[in-house]
């Protein structure tokens, strides 16, 4: 799955369904009164009977405003991208992924460095060396770009799906596998949110699993 094509398709579908997208609309506060959420943002006030927090690392700050916890942390990963080449990879791999256009995306690094998103030569060199040893033909291919980004990590690495008891209609969703889980989120989870309650299967991913005293 090409994540860029997937994101574009989901975004277009969102707009087709009369969704409204606001950029640079940082949220400052959320209140809940008589079944209605009031969200204060850089782009103004918004009210709705249902609220889904899917702000990635921002959920750590926002979730407590609706009575939930989202103990997420940033984990940096770096990626190298090769020139376009003929089809080489036809099996799933964690280190190497080939796009439909032919470029190979290389990388599975994990760095606990807070919110630092700078690229580092030593990590990129390690990634390139592992790729060369995994698939020797890559040694002669050019790297055309690279970048670093932050994963949204829970304490155990698995998703966190929660619904608020003190603010009914409020949900918090966190994962670092958005592309892999897109189908489940679009169909199963969306239906549960519309119904106002997570199914038993999703409830097992609640943040409460980290509360030893509650278990």
Q: Predicted segment positions?
A:
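C-terminal catalytic lobe of FAD-dependent flavoproteins
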Residues: 3, 135-215
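Helical element adjacent to the flavin cofactor pocket in flavoenzyme catalytic cores
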Residues: 1-50, 58
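A short, compositionally biased micro-patch
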Residues: 32-33, 75, 99, 164
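Short glycine-/acidic-enriched loop or helix-start segments at secondary-structure transitions
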Residues: 32, 62-64, 91, 115-117, ...
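Active-site lid/adjacent beta-loop-alpha segment flanking the redox-cofactor pocket in flavoenzymes
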Residues: 85-168
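Central helical "cap/lid" subdomain
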Residues: 41, 45-88, 120
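Mid-domain beta-loop-alpha active-site segment that forms a flexible
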Residues: 1-13, 56-58, 123-130, 175, ...
């Amino acid at each position: 799955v090409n994540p860029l094509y997937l994101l574009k398709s989901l975004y277009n579908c969102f707009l087709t369904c009369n969704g409204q997208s606001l950029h640079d609309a940082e949220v400052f506060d959320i209140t809940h009164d008589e079944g209605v959420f009031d969200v204060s943002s850089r782009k103004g006030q918004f009210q709705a009977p249902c609220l889904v927090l899917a702000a990635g690392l921002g959920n750590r700050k926002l979730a407590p405003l609706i009575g939930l916890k989202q103990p997420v942390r940033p984990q940096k990963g770096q990626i190298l991208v090769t020139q376009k080449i003929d089809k080489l990879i036809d099996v799933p791999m964690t280190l190497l992924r080939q796009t439909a256009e032919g470029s190979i995306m290389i990388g599975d690094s994990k760095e606990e460095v807070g919110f630092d998103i700078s690229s580092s030569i030593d990590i990129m060199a390690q990634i390139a060396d592992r790729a060369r040893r995994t698939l020797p033909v890559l040694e002669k291919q050019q790297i055309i770009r690279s970048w670093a980004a932050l994963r949204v990590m829970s304490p155990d690495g698995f998703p966190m799906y929660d619904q608020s008891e003190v603010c009914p209609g409020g949900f918090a969703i966190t994962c670092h596998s958005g592309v892999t889980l897109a189908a489940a989120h679009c169909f199963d989870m969306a239906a549960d949110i519309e119904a106002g309650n997570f199914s038993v299967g999703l409830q097992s991913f609640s943040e409460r699993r980290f509360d030893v005293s509650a278990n």
